[in-house]
Amino acid sequence: MTISLRGVGASLAGKRVLQGIDLQILPGQVTALVGPNGAGKSTLLGVMAGDIEAADGEVALHGSPIRSIPPKERASLRTVMRQSFEMSFAFLVRDIVEMGVLDQVPEREKRHIVDRALRETEMTAFRNRPVTRLSGGERQRVSFTRAVAQIRSSEHLDAPRFLFLDEPTASLDMAYQALILNRARSFAAEGLGVVIVLHDLNLAAAAADRILLLSGGRVVTDGPPETVVREEVLAPAFAAPVSVFEADGGRHVAVRLGE
């Protein structure tokens, strides 16, 4: 079961933001979308998930146009954690997490799924707190926990699943960044196709099996970290002097200042 994009382009507010995208998203793999600001990363994620309509080309889930799949059915096939999370009402954390549980799940199972999601994301201590009293980083953690609840509820439907995370590590400390990315890798090991938008190239190199480097609305490089995280690849895409070095068994990126 794959998500396929063929000749895909997209526009937002009359501006062309994606063009000529051809790729497949595979199950059992973590794919990171990286690139400079305005490269089209979040738009590409939205197109893949079926939330943003492509201006041209085709986006298909196992051969079926993804936008033709009814929203309720689409929710059982993929989970999306969006970049922004605003909540003006004083819902408790457990209420927000339960909103991620699919309607098709029997009522008696919902509490078990919520409790499991809270445990898996180390958020049990927050379950009875109003979200309006949480910091931005804590709200980001709640948003991820809600996504986990949706994933766990979709297990009851025996459906192919994809997870889309838009900047999930923003506003988080290093410990919770690691937790989210480790969970993403665990979901891939369970057979999910995972797509993550990341600004931090070091996190992308550590967590991803595959990296798509975007620039100017196009995928300019597509491959494993060892082929994408290279000075000669990153420097022109980001228009910045970078150094890439090996340490602790992985690749790391640093910007050279003063050049």
List each language-model region with its residue ranges.
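Helix-to-loop junction immediately C-terminal to a conserved catalytic motif
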Residues: 49
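Catalytic Walker B motif of ABC-type/P-loop ATPase nucleotide-binding domains
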Residues: 157-158, 163-167
